[in-house]
Amino acid sequence: VDFTKVNSESLEEFLRNGKEEAVHLFVEEYTKTLGKSNMDSFMFCQYMLINIQVGVMKFVEKMGVEKANIDRTFKDYKQQIAAVSTGEKAAEYIEELIIQAIRMRNERLGKKHSSLITEAKEFIVKNYQEETLSLSDVADQVGLSSSHFSTTFKQETGKSFVEFLTSVRMD
């Protein structure tokens, strides 16, 4: 059994950027890199699942998800890990864990973006009379890059920054 094959970096990268619909393919590739003999080992699967579980919980905690919410979401993980007896069951459990983490990430990012856009709109309303007010000024205020802010602002409000600023100035 080769424990060095567990790659926590690729898991963390997927947790940060992966999409829910790509989880199955990611887990398939991830478990393939671990090797069939490792996936057929009960001891290896238990080790891997605990390692992944801890990685997922650390990830959502770093995202700012409340500890009570993490504990509630993953409360039965010890029993679930103990019940895994095959490589296929391990892969299914990994998929469940990652999907839950991605949903928590997306919910958290949605709330974060929503509050940033609210802050940006308040800043615009307070400073709209300044002729030099620009998208980059507002993006700096909320701590986002100009391009990311522009995209997020349009998605959240349905208006571009310029359209919103113009409507505020006209009111």
Regions found by a protein language model. Name each.
Residues 1-171:
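Cytosolic nucleotide-utilizing catalytic cores of signal-transduction proteins
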